[in-house]
Amino acid sequence: MLSRINPRDTTAVWRQPRVVLWTTAGVVTLGFLIALEIAARHYGMPGPITNQAKEVIFAPKSGPLLYASMALMMVVLTWRQRFIAIGAAIGIDLVFFFVRWIVDAKMMFGNGALWVILACAVIAVTRRTGKERVLLLKGVGLGLLLVAGRKTGDAWLLITSKTRPMVLDQYVATADHALGNPSWLVGRIVRATGSTGAHILDWVYIQLAVAAVAAALYQLRHVAAERRFPKHHLVRTFLVIGLLGPGIYMIFPVVGPIFAYGWGAFGTGSEHLALGNIWPDTPPPLTPPEPMLYDELTPRNCMPSLHTAWATAIFIHSRRGPRVLRYAGTFWLLATLGATLGFGYHYGADIVAGVVFTLTIEAGLRAFDRGWERSGIQLVAYGAIVFTALLISYRYLSVQMADLPWLFGPLIILSMVSVIYLYVRTMKMWDPKPGGPVQQPEPQPAMV
């Protein structure tokens, strides 16, 4: 049924500050995707827009991710509409399965979910007006941003490998001596658990986005009834981490211990490119670090650890959920730490930076919602200072850190703990327990 809303009301809706913000964000995101598409094609590879468009017809890279994106979009739908959407997606996928089986093509599900998301976008534009159109477009936007984020990340990784031939692994590995070389230690532990432990950690590592959607669905469970989104939720943090993180890769390119000190992974890297095949059996020697040349295929995606950052965000946002969600958030964080270190994808220094990175972004988003009051500005500034200090220390003080592990090891951990403490203290002021005193945001100057 068409919504019957006065055109003046529609105009008023589009002039609301939050609608303007969402529209601006959409335009910026589109421009960003176009820029990445151009950059990827410059290096002879399809970009995020092309790869996503292919999945309308061809077998998608990740079916679970597409269905998770559809689930995220469906938070704006009624239960009847959700059942229709799920049925349509499954029906479309069955048709694709049958056709692929006939032509002996790659079998993968997920096209149906993408078709449903795109159909909802068409319905929003052609069959909805006013607030209902905005709400449905927000849902579609969140779903598409999740799948586009995966494609965007792939393009970013390609760009880092092509534009940053020199990597700084020797500096991070040297600094990691102050932390006791945790990647080497956890790597030996994971190997001792055998194939079972490795398969569990690998599944957790790969399905991180699906776990994020599960936590986000709980946060957004009232959207359909209230016809509005909450001010802050996990998806916002997840997307901002993915947007800002690759920029740090360009500044501090690192490939990881399995590549710099091992045989490589994911079909990239090799022993002849590494300093030696010593991970995880022998910690790297204490020699003066220097930038090292690496291939043009391996992503420079270690500093900071975005998997740790995303898992930390899931942990934070699961704290207000039911017990099973809190337990799941804790498990996902611990398992992600085990995978990132145990598979040799990251150094301990990356993990510390990833935690600080997440808390700073989370604080910034919360502070933005509250009007940038003093406590929020202080928290964001402190987190940014600590994060910057960590990266500078890894680059220019790595030898001193390795020579004095009894001093710098505790200092690194203390810097991370201090950000955690300030974040927790600030959140307690902003989100008091029921019955406690409520701190109101500081008054802001009126807009004239």
Positions of the model-derived regions?
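Membrane-interfacial loop-to-transmembrane alpha-helix junctions, especially the N-terminal start
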Residues: 15-28, 75-92, 134-140, 230-238, ...
